[in-house]
């Protein structure tokens, strides 16, 4: 049984799909049988112990006979009445107008946004000069105050040193007078 299954598997590997299908339907194929599938012919050459051999013949587009199935075209629509055509034209015109209005609305919104941005930029530019001048004046005043405070502190230290030096001189003179 196992040898039969393995032999069957080997046979299946050798057979083409087409011969497999044909052998399922026709156990004994007729000699030199020609099968037609659309624009190709399959001709059985001979049957061997190892399998079957076939010749596949493709027809050129010019050889296609009128008997072969033609690609089906979509079914023709019935003739539309004048009223239907008029309704379609009106609907198309309405869609076009709606689309055009929508595009114009978007353009108007874009222009309005551009105007707002430009106006804001001009406003900031006009406000920038006074603000910059104000900041500069503030910084100058602040640095002037800091400088004056620093100079006042230096003067105070210098005055204290002079007072200390005068006291030291006085003490020295008093010692000299006492000792001398």
Swiss-Prot record:
InterPro entries: Stathmin_CS, Stathmin_fam, Stathmin_sf
S-palmitoyl cysteine-type lipidated residues: 22, 24
Low complexity: bias regions: 60-74
Top-level taxon of the source organism: Eukaryota
Keywords: Cell projection, Coiled coil, Cytoplasm, Golgi apparatus, Lipoprotein, Palmitate, Phosphoprotein
Annotated spans, Disordered: 58-81
Stretches assigned to the SLD domain: 38-180
Role: Exhibits microtubule-destabilizing activity, which is antagonized by STAT3.
Protein name (database record): Stathmin-3
The organism of origin for this protein: Rattus norvegicus (Rat)
